Amino acid sequence: MSRYTGPRLKIMRALGVDLPGLGRKSMQERNQPPGQHGARKVAARKSEFGLQLMEKQKLRYNYGVTERQLRRVVLDAKRQKGVTGGKIVELLERRLDNLVFRAGFAPTTRLRANS
């Protein structure tokens, strides 16, 4: 199973959100985008595609799933009755590794997969 093993704080800074299980550090100290010129980047207006991509990446990194796993969850949610967005979150919350994290047995999302 492949998973992201790179710097977690850089992901949080790129997304602009403090993801709860991604790490123990918060974005309070360095809240600018990552990179050499991150502090000087002007907040340009994102396109609709850019906003949707950002939200998808937040979901992926928050729940620790790959692109293929997320696609499978979305297809399952489309088949079920009800609001698709709510079903996606419901299916992701039902995963065993997420239940281990929510129950408090693992402090971070990386450790929840090992439990």
Swiss-Prot record:
Recite the other comments. A C-terminally tuncated form of ribosomal protein uS4, this is probably not functional.
Q: Which NCBIfam families match?
A: PRK05327.1 (NF003717)
Which family does the entry's similarity section mention?
Belongs to the universal ribosomal protein uS4 family.
Q: Which organism is this protein's natural source?
A: Azoarcus sp. (strain BH72)
- Supply the name of the protein: Ribosomal protein uS4-like
Q: Name one GO molecular function term.
A: rRNA binding
Q: InterPro entries recorded for this chain?
A: Ribosomal_uS4_N
